[in-house]
Amino acid sequence: MNIREWPAEERPREKLLQRGAVVLTDAELLAVLLGSGVAGRNVLDLARGLLVRFGGLRQFLEAEREAVLREPGIGMVKYAQLQALLEIGRRYLDENIKRAAALDGPAAVRRYLKAMLRHEVSEVFGCLFLDSKHRPLAFEILFRGTIDRASVYPREVVRRALLHNAAALILCHNHPSGSSEPSQDDVHLTLSLKRGLALIDVRVLDHIIIGDGEPLSMVEHGWIVA
């Protein structure tokens, strides 16, 4: 059945307008973004199929461009719109955290950093720069690497901390392989950065690792001392 023939309260777009986006399923939200289906498949069936094949909404939005463009109903324009939406979401979250009077706890920091890094398909390393009251000054991805490694240069981290006049910072990087467990290289790098930043009176409060599950705090797990 064509989706236009459905009762209004069951159509994703009308449902969103009447009841709010929060009540929609992932497939319904994606259907609203896609706008239309393809021959023989309405837009909701198309959205459901995409989520099944890619393994979920996050996996679909973060998939390689070539893989997405192979799907029926997804052209370059639609792909660009989806990527723009993803970036808008990240920037909205980034703006919210910058406006915060202070970080309200480690859990909020982990949620924020996960949202900023989880889409990356290669390993990246970033810093959340903080003032003396641990209020956010800026977040930057400083280094990008391959699927399993990003080269980090302590001198550049120090330079960016000075540029932002930071009193403290939180290091972060992702593990695209999925595991959040720190490697020995991760631990050694963190200790090296702590020593270097201490020379300019900048504290390293934590190093957060983003994998497939919950973000890992190296401080909370005893790998380093804040």
Swiss-Prot record:
Q: Where is this motif: JAMM motif?
A: 173-186
The domain of life is Bacteria
The record ties this protein, via PROSITE patterns, to: MPN, UPF0758
Q: Which UniProt keywords apply?
A: Hydrolase, Metal-binding, Metalloprotease, Protease, Zinc
Write out the GO biological process terms: proteolysis
Coiled-coil annotated spans: none
Which InterPro entries did the record assign? MPN, RadC_JAB, RuvA_2-like, UPF0758, UPF0758_CS, UPF0758_N
Task: State where Zn(2+) binds.
Answer: 173, 175, 186
**A Pfam short name:** UPF0758_N
- Identify a single GO molecular function assigned to this protein: metal ion binding
Please report the stretch or stretches of sequence annotated as the MPN domain: 102-224
Q: Which family does it belong to?
A: Belongs to the UPF0758 family.
Q: Could you identify this protein by its name?
A: UPF0758 protein PputGB1_5335
Question: Which species does this protein come from?
Answer: Pseudomonas putida (strain GB-1)
From the broadest rank down, the organism's phylogenetic lineage runs: Bacteria, Pseudomonadati, Pseudomonadota, Gammaproteobacteria, Pseudomonadales
